[in-house]
Amino acid sequence: MAQFDVYARVGRTKSYVVDLQADLLDQLTLRVVAPMVISSTATVISGLTPLVQFQDNEYILLTYQLAAGPARELQDPVGSLSADQDAIKRALDILFLGF
């Protein structure tokens, strides 16, 4: 389990969550995640919801919909957004710090 890993949501087609929690907190039983949806299904909020490319599609990472869930439910990552970590971190700064 690694920060920025992408996991398919159980029972949902083309719906994913991204693990945003720092790797050094692996001992916790919960992980902080945010949903990622096809870009045509949500509105981009400048800076707050980064656009990312994943599996040949454009997605929006909905950082303002953070949630914590059991780490055991995150099985077998289907990819990673580590290449987009700068945009994701900027979005989280906007969410928590306002800039």
Model segments located where?
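Compact nucleic-acid interaction/catalytic patches
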Residues: Q3-V6, V10-P50
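C-terminal terminal-subdomain/extension
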Residues: F54-F99
